[in-house]
Curated annotation (Swiss-Prot):
<comment type="function">
    <text>Catalyzes a cyclopropane ring-opening reaction, the irreversible conversion of 1-aminocyclopropane-1-carboxylate (ACC) to ammonia and alpha-ketobutyrate. Allows growth on ACC as a nitrogen source.</text>
</comment>
<dbReference type="InterPro" id="IPR001926">
    <property type="entry name" value="TrpB-like_PALP"/>
</dbReference>
<dbReference type="GO" id="GO:0018871">
    <property type="term" value="P:1-aminocyclopropane-1-carboxylate metabolic process"/>
</dbReference>
<keyword id="KW-0378">Hydrolase</keyword>
<dbReference type="InterPro" id="IPR020601">
    <property type="entry name" value="ACP_carboxylate_deaminase_bac"/>
</dbReference>
<dbReference type="InterPro" id="IPR027278">
    <property type="entry name" value="ACCD_DCysDesulf"/>
</dbReference>
<comment type="similarity">
    <text>Belongs to the ACC deaminase/D-cysteine desulfhydrase family.</text>
</comment>
<dbReference type="Pfam" id="PF00291">
    <property type="entry name" value="PALP"/>
</dbReference>
<dbReference type="GO" id="GO:0009310">
    <property type="term" value="P:amine catabolic process"/>
</dbReference>
<dbReference type="GO" id="GO:0019148">
    <property type="term" value="F:D-cysteine desulfhydrase activity"/>
</dbReference>
<keyword id="KW-0663">Pyridoxal phosphate</keyword>
<comment type="subunit">
    <text>Homotrimer.</text>
</comment>
<dbReference type="GO" id="GO:0008660">
    <property type="term" value="F:1-aminocyclopropane-1-carboxylate deaminase activity"/>
</dbReference>
<protein>
    <recommendedName>
        <fullName>1-aminocyclopropane-1-carboxylate deaminase</fullName>
        <ecNumber>3.5.99.7</ecNumber>
    </recommendedName>
</protein>
<feature type="modified residue" description="N6-(pyridoxal phosphate)lysine">
    <location>
        <position position="51"/>
    </location>
</feature>
<dbReference type="GO" id="GO:0030170">
    <property type="term" value="F:pyridoxal phosphate binding"/>
</dbReference>
<dbReference type="InterPro" id="IPR036052">
    <property type="entry name" value="TrpB-like_PALP_sf"/>
</dbReference>
Length: 338
């Protein structure tokens, strides 16, 4: 496998820390050891997160093309668009963000606080669009790029989650390589890695990276899209493409992509009771915050799988904390009493 042949522009602090979740593990019976790899602490650029790791491989391409404007898309409380805005500010580039109405959640401040507030503060041109949730290529995004061209600019397209970008899976191939180095220092290997999946390239990159040592199917995706067939297809497609890019040396199969579909409801962006219990439990036992759109659902999945005995006794499970906490203020009504 050869990731090193791709240029990488450093946007992160370096390897993200692995933190033992001792109190949560003990609360759940102590038979499974839980750890978190803190991608939410990976950068000083507007709270960072998993997209910042991905963007390290997109930025060299944008600079090589002479682009002057990063154009991306997400929901109103998109972590992706906030991270793109931060990178644009860091590089001295312009930024256009399409923010669609992906979540059926009504709150007077939903489009004024959290991620979208930070994007505006960083100087992004934020464009609210009424279109609903979809993880594919969007007309509104293509129209935004055309508007940049018509104004004399040179846009660089960054799709939702970086996922449909040809290089979108590379960052999390690097994640797997980083984990292997940390495992050597820790003196053990993780039996499972739990990760939230929606647009797919985070899990896809992990699948490829861990396939290099036979652990592709030990990456347990927790669907938060509530459109699992679409997400599974996209993860698989991106993983196959990424495997070819890095010369993995073996094909990615359907069996390599594990996606647990039990925790996404009621729909994208809306938490269920299990999501909320997981968010509060993790906060109160570990002081680690998760959000109701993504990480709360993957945390719910991990906790429930431990409770059901789906991880063998003695297993060491690594939870990939991808970020998302800046969106919490947009859900303040839900958490008004903690």
């Amino acid at each position: 496998m050869n990731l090193q042949r791709f240029s990488r522009y450093p946007l992160t602090f370096g390897p993200t820390p692995i933190q033992p979740l001792k109190r949560l593990s003990q609360h759940l019976g102590g038979k499974v050891e839980l750890y978190a790899k803190r991608e939410d602490c990976n950068s000083g650029l507007a709270f960072g997160g998993n997209k910042t790791r991905k963007l390290e491989y997109l930025v060299p391409d944008a600079l090589a093309q002479g682009a002057d404007t990063l154009v991306s898309i997400g929901g109103v409380q998109s972590n992706q668009t906030r991270q793109v805005a931060a990178v644009a500010a860091h590089l001295g580039m312009k930024c256009v963000l399409v923010q669609e109405h992906w979540v059926n959640y009504e709150d007077p401040v939903y489009d004024r606080v959290g991620n979208i507030q930070l994007s505006r503060m960083m100087g992004a041109d934020v464009r609210l669009v009424a279109d609903g949730f979809d993880i594919g290529i969007r007309r509104s995004w293509e129209e935004a790029m055309e508007s940049v061209r018509q104004a004399g600019g040179k846009p660089y397209p960054i799709p939702a989650g970086c996922s449909e970008h040809p290089l979108g899976g590379l960052g999390f191939v690097g994640f797997a390589e980083e984990v292997r180095e940390q495992e050597a220092q820790l003196g053990f290997k993780f039996d499972y890695v739990v990760v939230c999946s929606v647009t797919g390239s985070t899990q896809a990159g992990m699948v490829v990276g861990f396939a290099a040592d036979g652990r592709a199917d030990r990456v347990i995706g927790i669907d938060a899209s509530a459109t699992p067939e679409r997400t599974h297809e996209q993860i698989t497609r991106i993983a196959r493409h990424t495997a070819e890019l890095v010369d993995l040396g073996r094909p990615i199969t359907e069996a390599d992509v594990v996606l647990d579909t039990r925790y996404a409801g009621p729909e994208y962006g809306l938490p269920n009771d299990g999501t909320l219990e997981a968010i509060r439990l993790c906060a109160r036992l570990e002081g680690m915050l998760t959000d109701p759109v993504y990480e709360g659902k993957s945390m719910h999945g991990m906790i429930d799988k431990v409770r059901r005995g789906e991880f063998e006794p003695g297993s060491k499970v690594l939870y990939a904390h991808l970020g998302g906490v800046p969106a919490l203020s947009a859900y303040a009504e839900i958490f008004r009493n903690g």
